[in-house]
């Protein structure tokens, strides 16, 4: 059984999506996958980003790709890992930029739940993965679903900040109305690309400056 319950404010916004043929196919695919493979995150955490940041609470969107595929890493929030799990390299680089940008101490835990509670929606474009197989659930329907999520956030809200790291995330800018929202693009924080412009991109201070300029409360980024 795949547990796909979603927080009530999101359920209301996405109700039509859950009835569509592609989503039924995606559910069938996940049921079959679960019989044969270990999947991450646990099915009860697939929609953890939605549970942690209700629709009306979203102020910032940080877009990831697919979940971490190592044991105990993924828990449904993009880039975040469970307490007690060493932060992966991309997250270490995010924390380095956090320190260099706004002076936060480097967090000891890689759990970003406190950001989610501050209105930072930590969305992966694909919400499940096979253990040890990156991108194994690519092009199975999740992208259609998360594109709709991004588009609906853009349409129904205003003055959001969308933080898009890396080319795949950057391509999602076409779903966002830049007259209503701030889009911040930079290279991915992965060690392969972080020195090509991720470091020094100042996403945290730029986000807070924008929110303050719109009369909104800045994010408490320090963990």
UniProtKB/Swiss-Prot annotation:
Keyword Protease: no
Superkingdom of this protein's organism: Bacteria
Keyword Hydrolase carried by entry: yes
Residues annotated as the enzyme's active site: 66 (proton acceptor)
GO biological process: base-excision repair, AP site formation via deaminated base removal
Enzyme class: hydrolase
Subcellular location: Cytoplasm
Membrane-spanning residues: none
UniProt keywords, alphabetically: Cytoplasm, DNA damage, DNA repair, Hydrolase
EC nos: 3.2.2.27
PROSITE patterns, per database record: U_DNA_GLYCOSYLASE (PS00130)
Cross-referenced InterPro entries: UDG_fam1, Ura-DNA_Glyclase_AS, Uracil-DNA_glycosylase-like, Uracil-DNA_glycosylase-like_sf
Location, primary (coarse class): cytoplasm
Name of one Pfam family that matches: UDG
Gene Ontology terms: cellular component: cytoplasm
Gene Ontology MF term list: uracil DNA N-glycosylase activity
Catalysis performed (reactions): Hydrolyzes single-stranded DNA or mismatched double-stranded DNA and polynucleotides, releasing free uracil
Main function: Excises uracil residues from the DNA which can arise as a result of misincorporation of dUMP residues by DNA polymerase or due to deamination of cytosine.
Family indicated by similarity: Belongs to the uracil-DNA glycosylase (UDG) superfamily. UNG family.
Name under which the protein is recorded: Uracil-DNA glycosylase
Organism classification: Bacteria, Pseudomonadati, Campylobacterota, Epsilonproteobacteria, Campylobacterales
């Amino acid at each position: 059984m795949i547990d796909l319950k979603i927080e009530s404010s999101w359920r209301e916004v996405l109700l039509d999506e859950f009835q569509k043929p592609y989503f039924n196919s995606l559910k069938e695919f996940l049921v079959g996958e679960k019989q044969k493979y270990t999947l991450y995150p646990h099915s009860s955490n697939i929609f953890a980003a939605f549970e942690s940041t209700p629709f009306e609470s979203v102020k910032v969107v940080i877009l990831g790709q697919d979940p971490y595929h190592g044991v105990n890493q993924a828990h449904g929030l993009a880039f975040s890992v469970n307490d007690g799990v060493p932060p992966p390299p991309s997250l270490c680089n995010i924390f380095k930029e956090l320190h260099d940008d706004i002076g936060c101490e480097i967090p000891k835990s890689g759990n970003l739940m406190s950001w989610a509670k501050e209105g930072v929606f930590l969305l992966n474009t694909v919400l499940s993965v096979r253990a040890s197989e990156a991108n194994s659930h690519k092009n199975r329907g999740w992208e259609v679903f998360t594109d709709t999520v991004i588009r609906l956030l853009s349409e129904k809200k205003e003055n959001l900040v969308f933080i898009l790291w890396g080319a795949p995330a950057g391509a999602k800018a076409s779903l966002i109305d830049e007259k209503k929202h701030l889009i911040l693009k930079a290279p991915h924080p992965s060690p392969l690309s972080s020195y090509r412009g991720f470091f020094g991109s100042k996403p945290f201070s730029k986000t807070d400056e924008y929110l303050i300029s719109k009369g909104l409360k800045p994010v408490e980024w320090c963990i």
